[in-house]
UniProtKB/Swiss-Prot annotation:
Keywords: Calcium, Disulfide bond, Endoplasmic reticulum, GPI-anchor biosynthesis, Membrane, Metal-binding, Signal, Transferase, Transmembrane, Transmembrane helix. Ca(2+) binds at residues 79, 82, 118, 120. PANTHER family: GPI-ANCHOR TRANSAMIDASE. Residues 386-395 are cytoplasmic. GO terms for biological process: attachment of GPI anchor to protein; GPI anchor biosynthetic process; proteolysis. This is GPI-anchor transamidase. Belongs to the peptidase C13 family. Residues 231-236 are annotated as: Autoinhibitory loop.
């Protein structure tokens, strides 16, 4: 009996000694994962979206900016991490036939102004000075948090700008301009002050590529709607309001983004191809040499989406629900599967359905026969009133 006890004890000790390295290995792997997570260079995303144009005929520039705003919000970036600057309030413009709305598509179903737009800088507050102060953090202490870019050295920042520009400059409010040198220096200040990890700069304007020619700071990727010497063209004219609804480049970028979901593996190389010259008429450009990573390894959601926080733990968590609840949920799920087919992520969003639906039919116009009959009636009344002698005054 004693021998049997010593034999069992020996086997138990031997098994413990054999399993000890495996337990240590698992614990070390978890520690390595935790250390890698906390040392990650990317923990949060920010967006600075700027429309620099005023006046009703620049309606499309406001629609451009609001469309990008809705896309980044849909992919998870909250308003607290978005700085929205609109140089004019098209939603409340007296010429707007549908007040409190801004549309980006002909079918007039997608109101990009929406009910939850938070404009941080509006009207004449949108200036070159305020824009540069937001980027560099040189703002008065009384400035509210919603108007601050509170990024750090782990922040990926999307900066989108649209308006009227030329070779090496972008106009603000038709009264001042920012040059490519000023913009490059602002980005360098951001890098020196550790205000970003990686930066994506997108500009939709004439000769947009000239705005990123002077960049010299690291970890910047830039895209433009047109090359130097080219115009960036508008898209979707709407006779009802007398202006174009969007610019071509931003229109196709928006269509591309509507197919992206938070778990998408689409990379930046795909974004470079969204608007070829056959669609944009202008030649879009991009610059990646200051960027350290290969664009094909950079996900779209690294800039347009939220960063999902992951908590690593060694504790055991039970994932088994209550048996009664599980049974009822399975029965309900079975009924739902019979009633509906599975949908893709983009198909579940009302925005995507609106964008890809066919435009509404044009307004009713009288048929040609009706017009001819009306003219015949007018001529008969004329003859009856004045006679054939006045015919020479018509022809």
């Amino acid at each position: 009996m004693v021998g049997t006890w010593f034999l069992c004890r020996g086997f138990t000790t031997l098994a413990g000694l054999l399993l000890l390295p495996f337990g240590s290995l698992a614990a070390s792997q978890i520690e390595d994962q935790a250390e890698q997570f906390f040392r990650s260079g990317h923990t949060n995303n920010w967006a600075v979206l700027v429309c620099t144009s005023r006046f009703w005929f620049n309606y499309r520039h406001v629609a451009n900016t609001l469309s990008v705003y809705r896309s980044v919000k849909r992919l998870g970036i909250p308003d607290s991490h978005i700085v929205l600057m609109l140089a004019d309030d098209m939603a409340c413009n007296p010429r707007n036939p549908k007040p409190a709305t801004v549309y980006s598509h002909k079918n007039m179903e997608l109101n990009v102004y929406g009910d939850d737009v938070e404009v941080d800088y509006r009207s004449y507050v949108v200036t070159v000075e305020n824009f540069l102060r937001v980027l560099t953090g040189r703002i008065p202490p009384s400035t509210p948090r919603s108007k601050r870019l509170l990024s750090d050295d782990r922040s990926n920042i999307l900066i989108y700008m649209t308006g009227h520009g030329g070779n090496g400059f972008l106009k603000f409010q038709d009264s001042e301009e920012i040059t490519n040198i000023e913009l490059a220096d602002a980005f360098e200040q951001m890098w020196q002050k550790r205000r970003y990890n990686e930066l994506l700069f997108i500009i939709d304007t004439c000769q947009g590529a000239s705005m990123y020619e002077r960049f010299y700071s690291p970890n910047i990727m830039a895209l433009a709607s047109s090359q130097v010497g080219e115009d960036s063209l508008s898209h979707q004219p709407d006779p009802a309001i007398g202006v174009h609804l969007m610019d071509r480049y931003t229109f196709y970028v928006l269509e591309f983004l509507e197919e992206i979901n938070p778990a998408s593996q689409t990379n930046m190389n795909d974004l470079f191809q969204v608007c070829p010259k056959s669609l944009c008429v202008s030649t879009p450009g991009h610059r990646t040499d200051p960027f350290q990573r290969d664009p094909k390894h950079v996900l779209i959601t690294d800039f347009f989406g939220s960063v999902r926080k992951v908590e690593i733990t060694t504790e055991t968590i039970s994932l088994q629900p209550d048996s009664g609840i599980m049974k009822s949920s399975h029965e309900k799920a079975g009924m739902d599967e019979e009633l509906m087919e599975p949908l893709k992520y983009a198909e579940q969003l009302p925005v995507a359905q609106i964008i890809h639906q066919k435009p509404k039919l044009k307004d009713w116009h009288p048929p040609g026969g009706f017009i001819l009959g009306l003219w015949a009636l007018i001529i008969m009344v004329f003859f009856k009133t004045y006679g054939i002698k006045h015919m020479k005054f018509i022809f």
